[in-house]
C-alpha cells in the first residue's frame, strides 16, 4: 500500500472514531419520532403565587414562551431534550430567576432552534415578568391579570405578545421585529432600532411606539388616551385607528393615515410627508409641521369648529388630497 493511501485510511479512521465519540458523548438521537418536544418539568421551580412576585428571565440563544395557567403556581418547563441542562432556576427572596448556562462547543452544536423555556403565570397574579434574550424569540400569550406588568426584550430575536389583559406591556428589540395583537387594557410601550413594529386589535388607554429605521404598522386600534409614535427613517402607517390624540414625529419617515379618528393630531417631521384620510374631520384639530415633506389630503371641513395648523418650509401642501 502506498504511503498516501495509508495516510488517507488513517484520517478516515480518525474521523469515524471522532464521530462515534461525539455522538455517544452528546447522546444525539436522529430519530424524528423520538425527539423530545414534550415539556420537561423543573420541579424545583414550582412555587405558590404568593411566594413569587417577580420572574426574571435572562437567556442567550433559548426562546422563552410565557402563558397563563388556572393553577395557583408559577411553573417553569422546557421544550427540547437538552434544554434542562442549559437552564438554571432558583427562587430567591420572592424573585424567580431563570438563566441560561454557558455550554461547550459540542453541546451548542447539539442544541435545537426549537428549544425553549416555558413559563406559566397564574391568572390574577400580582407581579412583574421581565424576560430578556440575546437571540432567542420571546412570546407571551393569554396573560390575564389587572396587576401584572410584562417586560419582554431581545437583541436579535422577535418579540410577540397576544391576547393580553394586563396592567402594562413593555416590549423592546434591537434588530428583531415586534408583534402585538389582541390587547385589552393597560399601557403599551414598544420600541425597536431596526426591526419593524406591527400592532393590531388593541383597546387600551395610552400607547407609545418607536423605531429608528424600522416601519411601524397599527391596525384596528382604539385608544381613549394618546397614541405616541416616533420614527427616524421608518414609515408610520395607521389604519382603522381611533385615539383621543395622536402625537407623531419622524425625521425622514412618512405618516400614512387611513380611516383615522382623533380629536387632535400633532405631526412633526424634517423631510417626511403626511397623507391620508381622517374621520369626523369637522371635529378635528391639531398641527402639522414639516421642513421639506409634503402634506396631502389631511384637512378639516370648512365648517369645522377646530383649527388645523399646517407649516412647511419647502414641502408641497395639497389639502384636497
Enumerate the predicted regions with their spans.
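Short, surface-exposed interaction patches in beta-rich subdomains
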Residues: 143, 159-164, 168-169, 178-321
Amino acid at each position: 500500500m502506498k504511503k498516501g493511501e495509508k495516510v488517507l485510511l488513517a484520517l478516515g479512521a480518525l474521523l469515524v472514531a471522532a464521530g462515534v465519540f461525539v455522538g455517544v458523548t452528546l447522546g444525539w438521537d436522529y430519530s424524528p419520532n423520538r425527539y423530545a418536544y414534550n415539556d420537561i418539568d423543573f420541579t424545583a421551580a414550582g412555587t405558590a403565587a404568593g411566594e413569587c412576585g417577580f420572574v426574571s428571565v435572562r437567556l442567550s440563544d433559548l426562546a422563552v414562551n410565557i402563558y397563563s395557567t388556572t393553577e395557583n403556581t408559577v411553573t417553569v418547563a422546557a421544550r427540547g431534550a437538552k434544554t434542562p441542562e442549559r437552564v438554571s432556576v432558583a427562587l430567591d427572596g420572592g424573585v424567580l430567576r431563570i438563566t441560561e448556562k454557558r455550554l461547550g462547543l459540542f453541546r451548542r452544536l447539539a442544541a435545537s432552534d426549537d428549544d425553549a423555556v416555558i413559563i406559566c403565570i397564574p391568572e390574577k397574579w400580582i407581579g412583574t415578568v421581565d424576560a430578556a434574550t440575546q437571540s432567542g424569540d420571546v412570546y407571551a400569550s393569554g396573560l390575564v391579570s389587572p396587576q401584572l406588568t410584562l417586560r419582554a426584550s431581545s437583541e436579535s430575536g422577535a418579540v410577540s405578545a397576544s391576547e393580553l389583559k394586563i396592567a402594562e406591556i413593555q416590549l423592546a428589540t434591537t434588530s428583531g421585529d415586534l408583534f402585538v395583537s389582541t390587547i385589552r387594557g393597560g399601557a403599551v410601550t414598544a420600541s425597536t432600532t431596526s426591526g419593524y413594529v406591527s400592532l393590531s386589535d388593541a383597546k387600551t388607554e395610552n400607547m407609545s411606539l418607536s423605531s429608528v429605521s424600522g416601519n411601524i404598522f397599527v391596525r384596528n386600534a382604539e385608544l381613549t388616551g394618546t397614541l405616541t409614535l416616533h420614527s427616524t427613517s421608518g414609515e408610520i402607517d395607521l389604519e382603522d385607528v381611533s385615539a383621543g390624540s395622536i402625537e407623531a414625529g419622524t425625521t425622514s419617515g412618512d405618516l400614512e393615515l387611513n380611516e383615522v379618528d382623533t380629536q387632535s393630531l400633532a405631526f412633526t417631521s424634517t423631510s417626511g410627508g403626511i397623507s391620508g384620510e381622517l374621520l369626523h374631520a369637522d371635529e378635528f384639530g391639531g398641527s402639522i409641521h414639516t421642513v421639506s415633506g409634503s402634506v396631502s389630503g389631511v384637512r378639516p371641513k370648512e365648517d369645522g369648529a377646530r383649527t388645523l395648523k399646517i407649516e412647511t418650509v419647502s414641502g408641497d401642501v395639497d389639502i384636497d388630497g
